[in-house]
């Protein structure tokens, strides 16, 4: 289906909320610490340490964040997607951000400039390769979350494996 007709499904939004978890009070980001506090269901924009929220407010903010990431995804992806692929990619973009040339790697753009590996593969018609590229996002800071026995960020790796399977048409959010 063409991207213009797609929106994150209800199941996709629930998947993001479950993956991110809920925090009533702003907490340090697991990787960036207090420099990027997170609140509610993973919201970082405009959040300061000490901020608080309620579940309905957090869900509204998460939905606003989702819409921002959907916009970025729709600008960089040029091929049609199935709903399950779209939901997986929005979830990933929500977690890693869109990226910015010269600043940070992300879903759409690489730090080195140009599209991310995932987007290059996807726009080139390599749908399976794009799904596999989800697994490239396996680090939290300098920690490889895919390493067996890892206890500090194994949840991130589990999330990536689930998103890859979902993207390939397997597990649902």
Stretches found by the model and what they are:
Residues 54-67, 71-79:
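Helix-adjacent hinge/juxtasegments
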Residues 42-44:
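Solvent-exposed coil/turn segments that connect beta secondary-structure elements
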Residues 71-74, 94, 135, 139:
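A broad detector of the eukaryotic-type serine/threonine protein kinase catalytic domain
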Residues 85-100:
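Short N-proximal segments of mature Sec-exported proteins
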Residues 25-29, 73-87, 133:
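Surface-exposed patches in mature extracellular/periplasmic domains of secreted proteins
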Residues 68-72, 88, 114-117:
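A general alpha-helix detector
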Residues 1-36, 47, 53-63, 99-173:
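Long, amphipathic alpha-helical surface segments
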């Amino acid at each position: 289906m063409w991207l213009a007709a797609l929106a994150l499904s209800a199941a996709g939004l629930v998947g993001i909320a479950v993956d991110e978890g809920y925090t009533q009070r702003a907490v340090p980001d697991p990787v960036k610490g207090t420099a990027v506090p997170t609140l509610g269901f993973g919201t970082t924009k405009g959040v300061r340490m000490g901020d608080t929220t309620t579940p309905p407010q957090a869900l509204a903010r998460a939905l606003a964040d989702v819409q921002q990431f959907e916009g970025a995804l729709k600008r960089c992806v040029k091929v049609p997607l199935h709903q399950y692929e779209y939901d997986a990619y929005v979830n990933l973009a929500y977690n890693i951000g869109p990226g910015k040339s010269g600043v940070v790697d992300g879903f759409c753009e690489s730090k080195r400039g140009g599209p991310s590996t995932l987007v290059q593969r996807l726009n080139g018609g390599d749908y399976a390769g794009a799904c596999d590229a989800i697994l490239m996002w396996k680090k939290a800071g300098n920690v490889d979350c895919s390493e067996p026995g890892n206890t500090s960020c194994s949840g991130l790796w589990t999330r990536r494996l689930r998103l890859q399977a979902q993207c390939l048409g397997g597990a649902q959010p």
